[in-house]
């Protein structure tokens, strides 16, 4: 468990202030914020690379605020993997450790068995980061810190590295704090999110809560995410109608699924079953006054709940079981003669729904 109490550090041009933050044992907490918000400086304080002006850092009840980095039982993973160039993969992971049982578990979880004898110079960016993660785990840290760890990895490798992290967390249940500016990564791996802006922790909560109910206009603008819903994924593989309803082509690793909430069911492509999130960008939603003959699997009748003028665009809130937000122009609003209470149909493809 990680507890931060009344932490302060002067950073030009603001003061980093974290009055209190608790991260439970086994929890993954993701700290989101724009560039320059103080995220990396916060991690440096936790890791012991710099000292706070005030406050305490508690790891499993012990005050580590004034301890050097090597005595804190905290590991940190940076954007760039810093590996020993003269050692192979196995030697890098096991450097300074002699726990053969943990070593075997780590390389299996990370899928690195086939690379143990390889030199690190031949590794891809994603493989290098997995090696760095393995080495971080070999010291049996109480806390794992991650500083934008997927940022420098090519998009093709990123998903595999993120999946490896999730696999490690499921098996080892390590307490983790990751900082990033990428909200999709935050959604994918976090139990809770925090928003850091100009050194202030301005909001914390479950991912859906933070994205659906931002605490301020500034937070809402930063997140830029509309139509985020929590629910449950169920594979359609055994459904008699799945052959008809499966969108094609499907991204590798994804399958046709139903995303079920208390008030609606969506057709989506998912990469896992069980709890998760669905995100539908407003631009992916088509509006129609009448039902449409379309290949899109998701078509919902709804009612206009609210009309909000936002500069040159109009935001419609439409209740279709779930409340969707859609943006249209003033001209479209007039042409469709929409008002509060108007009936409207929402249409979007299963492949346009991002799933986490």
Where does each model-flagged region fall?
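ABC ATPase NBD coupling module
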Residues: 63-76, 214
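Glycine/charge-rich catalytic "coupling/switch" loops of P-loop NTPases
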Residues: 237-240, 262-307, 325-356
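Conserved ABC ATPase "signature" region
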Residues: 100-115, 166-167
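Conserved ABC ATPase signature
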Residues: 119-123, 127
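A short, proline-enriched helix->beta-strand linker immediately N-terminal to the Walker B motif
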Residues: 138-142
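Catalytic Walker B motif of ABC-type/P-loop ATPase nucleotide-binding domains
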Residues: 144-148
């Amino acid at each position: 468990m990680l507890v931060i109490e009344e932490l302060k550090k002067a950073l030009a041009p603001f003061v980093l202030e974290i009055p209190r933050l608790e991260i439970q044992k086994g929890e993954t907490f993701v700290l989101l914020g724009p560039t320059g918000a103080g995220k990396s400086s916060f991690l440096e304080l936790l890791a012991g690379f710099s000292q706070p002006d005030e406050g305490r850092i508690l790891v499993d009840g012990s005050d580590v605020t004034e301890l050097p980095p090597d005595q804190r039982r905290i590991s940190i993973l940076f954007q760039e993997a810093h590996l020993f160039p003269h050692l192979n993969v196995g030697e890098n992971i096991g450097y300074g450790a002699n726990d053969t049982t943990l070593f075997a578990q780590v390389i299996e979880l990370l899928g690195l068995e086939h690379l143990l004898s390889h030199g690190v110079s031949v590794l891809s960016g994603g493989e290098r980061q997995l090696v760095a993660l393995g080495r971080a785990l070999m010291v049996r840290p109480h806390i794992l810190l991650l500083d934008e760890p997927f940022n420098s990895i090519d998009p093709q490798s990123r998903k595999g590295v993120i999946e490896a992290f999730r696999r490690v967390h499921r098996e080892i249940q390590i307490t983790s704090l990751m900082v990033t500016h990428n909200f999709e990564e935050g959604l994918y791996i976090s139990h809770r999110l925090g928003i850091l802006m100009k050194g202030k922790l301005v909001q914390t909560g479950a991912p859906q809560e933070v994205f659906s109910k931002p605490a301020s206009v500034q937070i809402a603008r930063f997140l830029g995410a509309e139509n985020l819903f929590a629910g449950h994924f169920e594979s359609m593989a055994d459904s008699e109608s799945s052959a008809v309803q499966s969108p094609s082509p499907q991204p590798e690793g994804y399958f046709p699924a139903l995303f079920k909430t208390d008030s609606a069911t969506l057709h989506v492509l998912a990469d896992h079953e069980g709890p998760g999130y669905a995100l539908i960008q407003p631009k992916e939603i088509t509006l129609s006054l009448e039902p449409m003959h379309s290949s899109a699997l998701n078509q919902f009748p709804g009612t206009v709940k609210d009309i909000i003028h936002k500069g040159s665009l109009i935001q419609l809130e439409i209740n279709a079981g779930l409340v969707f937000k859609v943006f249209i122009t003033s001209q479209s609003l007039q042409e469709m003669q929409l008002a509060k209470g108007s009936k409207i149909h929402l249409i979007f493809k299963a492949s346009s729904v991002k799933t986490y």
